[in-house]
Amino acid sequence: MPNFSRRAVLLQIGASGLAAVTPGAALAQNRYAALDTQPWSYLDGSEARFLASMADVLIPEDDFPSASQAGVVDFIDLQLAGPYGQGAGLFLEGPFADGTPEQGWQTAHTPASLIRNGIARLEDGGTRLVDLDANDRSAFVERLSKGEGFDLGDVPVQTLFDEIWALVKEGYFSDPIYGGNKDYAGWEMIGFPGAHAYYTDHVDKNAPFPAPPKGIAHVPGTGRSADTARPLRAQTAREEG
Amino acid sequence: MVRELPKTDVVIVGAGWTGLAAAKELADAGQRCVVIERGDWRHDASNFGAPEEHDELKYARRKEHMIDTQTKTLSFRNSSDQTALPMRRLGSFLPGKGLGGAGIHWNGQLWRPLPSDLKMRSHYADRYGEAILDGLNVQDWGVTYDELEPHLDFFDRVCGTAGVAGNLNGETKEGGNPFEGPRSADYPNPPMKASPPLQLFQKTAQEMGYHPFQMPSANVTKAYENAYGAQLHPCTYCGFCERFGCGYYAKADPIICIYDVVKDHENFELRMNSQVLRVEKSADGKTATGVTYLDERGQEVFQPADTVCLNAYALWNVHLMLVSGLGKPYDPETGEGTVGRNYAYQTLAAAGVFFDKEVWSNPFMGAGALGMTIDDFNGDNFDHTDLGFVGGGYISANQTNGRPINYHPTPPDTPSWGPEWKKAVRENYLHHVGIVCHGSSVAVPGNYLDLDPTYKDAYGQPLLRMTFDFPENDRRMSAYVLSKAEEIARNMDNVRAVSTVNRAAEGESYSVVPYQTTHNTGGAVIGTDPTTSVVNRYGQMWDHHNVFVFGACLFPQNLGYNPTGPLMGLAYWTLDHMKNDYLQNPRPLMDA
Ligand SMILES: Cc1cc2nc3c(=O)[nH]c(=O)nc-3n(C[C@H](O)[C@H](O)[C@H](O)COP(=O)(O)OP(=O)(O)OC[C@H]3O[C@@H](n4cnc5c(N)ncnc54)[C@H](O)[C@@H]3O)c2cc1C
Ligand code: SF4
């Protein structure tokens, strides 16, 4: 299938008209280029591109935005810079041992250092995830999800995958005040009306509840939430051709 | 230097449901009460308002209302041949902290034990012969349903419980739970509204010959003035219930139901941000002299008291006993000792029901205790002959937690991420309900709590160590009850697919990672025999008569029900005996 990777990239680009006139290889180099100009709080550009590539395999674009289009990379960046990423809520006293899966998180890393070190080791040497074609990116994520064939030193592979996947879902579906779920993308997709919740008159009715989502910082009349997460950032991570 | 304060009558460790109930009852009885709570002050009126409280990331994922493992956690292993490691992150259970304890972020599923549950050993032995209990530490509670009933009823009136009585003074009532013990009075409030999936479950369960009823709920359905004169308001089905505080005054919690009516009492004093380190004992070791705690500035303080009440939650009560040398620690090698013995949990399984587009479940409309339940397979409500297990569980279609980050039901065989996952989440979110099997948990000699030899908490104290796996008995029970739930699911109308999950499935070990329930029980159990219980039938420690113990640590084994109704029944029973007997004449209330 000589054309497969090009086709995959075109699919990946989705509705972007530019895709038809730009060669696939060049596209791959520029994928997520906009991320380079972001004023990151924790991530650097290459980490952001890795996370965007991985997030968009986990939640790809269809009729609804992909993870990165919905601001998931911004969300992850802010989370890793904040208390959660820095280890709040994690008991990190030693001694450390691998433990069983039933014993849960046993690495000495904070989530932020787990992800930083994990990405560095995954990207060490070989082709960067962002440069793989869609098929290979999926295969990579598939292997990572099973923990197969990686040795990341003191970064447990399964924990790394689980943590990133949890963050991606959180970024896609949490209130937009945290920088993800941009324009209520995740909530629109499933039909969740948001934080303003009063259902006494409807709960026993077998009928849809077609209310547009409203977040905690909803701006009346706009269909949007105020960008309280990072007012300086106008644009979220977006794939560009 | 430890600062010593003037003596008080009663010191109470913990300001949750049991601690505030103790303070209210004992303050009214003329006892000067000091309540010591390690967490922050907070209030429904000022801290839990919508929309800010409706923040799933902050409260349901980052768990801001719950304990912080950096200051309080335990170590865990499945069996004593493993090395226990710290539970570094919250998961399987979510103990509370702060005013109201876990009572502010509970669901409000408010149950009573069955009469037979409270005499589990003698009941099963009589009906099936002793052999059915081989290898199990199943025990009688030493207190009967009839003795607890007035106190269970009182707690219903503290919470304004919504439900349909199934047994009113011995008379079976239509629409209620026909298996329950006799109630002396009806529920204070009518049941919750039933959502479409609950209506379908009810219809099918009825057709199959079962006895569905609306789950008893402390999400109040009408404006209600409780037994203490506090005011509650109707639930809005807001869907941000368990893990969240209720800003609508609709979920009965210890702050609005009890704290507000005791806070100005001359006999009540509350000290927040204060961590009790240990209970101090007299020179002869027979009584407690008070508690030592770290005050809000981190200074060590000794609070002397005539009577000590442990209301720190099941796990932390046991921890306090172990670090203070109260009672005799359990030794799994010899079977001797009682503190830490009979730790049990809750055995959960569930069937997921995927409807076609005709049925709108709208899972974001929900409440912590919105459920349609059958009790036909709980306790000994069914014949256990030749089943190979004791106990059971209720089966309930629940509409409680359909929030967008955590709730992504997908039919069996859907990939767990990627395009097909995304499509399946989109198509099923509004058309799904979960049917929970909320199973009992027997006590066995190998499941217990003690102190960890290696790991220490922020105060330099050894962590509590939990050794637990699902006993074979409960694996068989869970598989059986789940098969019944699955049958109901498949018989329901408009069902496209059914999925199942069983936390106690054969071959799988208990894990502290996925949330199951905050129903940790046992470790300081109630009874009439000091060799198998830590407290006598009045909740008084056998070894130290001025220490009274509250909470689910008292359960000799866990019920198929949520614990708060039963443990509050026990709390008011203990308080009754303290007020009307012990405090006039402090002494052991039973001979050892
Ligand atoms: C998400 C969730 C849902 C639940 N849903 C239900 C339900 O639907 N039905 C049901 O029956 N039960 C439910 N529960 C369980 C219920 O919350 C508990 O049974 C109940 O709160 C126990 O009350 P308690 O007074 O024993 O302990 P808690 O409410 O936990 O209060 C104990 C207090 O003691 C304090 N404390 C502990 N140690 C110390 C110390 N050393 N020094 C000072 N203070 C200390 C803690 O900070 C805490 O505030 C749920 C729990 C959770 C977390
Ligand atoms: S569902 Fe009802 S009881 Fe629960 S938090 Fe919302 S309003 Fe309160």
Language-model segments: which ranges?
Chain A
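Substrate-recognition/specificity elements adjacent to catalytic centers across diverse enzyme folds
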Residues: 57
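Mature-region segments of soluble proteins
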Residues: 35-36, 48-53, 64, 68-241
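Boundary at the C-terminal end of the N-terminal hydrophobic targeting segment
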Residues: 26-28
